[in-house]
């Protein structure tokens, strides 16, 4: 399986997005 630089960047973005979103939900 070959990984694109774009795919990797998108994955990182989604991971970070999901992380801060989860933190926000926990804070509320």
From Swiss-Prot:
The gene is trpL. The keyword Amino-acid biosynthesis applies. It holds the Pfam family Leader_Trp. It comes from the Bacteria. This is trp operon leader peptide. One of its GO terms (biological process) is L-tryptophan biosynthetic process. This protein is involved in control of the biosynthesis of tryptophan. InterPro entries: Leader_Trp_op. The lineage of its organism: Bacteria, Pseudomonadati, Pseudomonadota, Gammaproteobacteria, Enterobacterales. Keywords: Amino-acid biosynthesis, Aromatic amino acid biosynthesis, Leader peptide, Tryptophan biosynthesis. The keyword Amino-acid biosynthesis applies. It comes from Serratia marcescens.
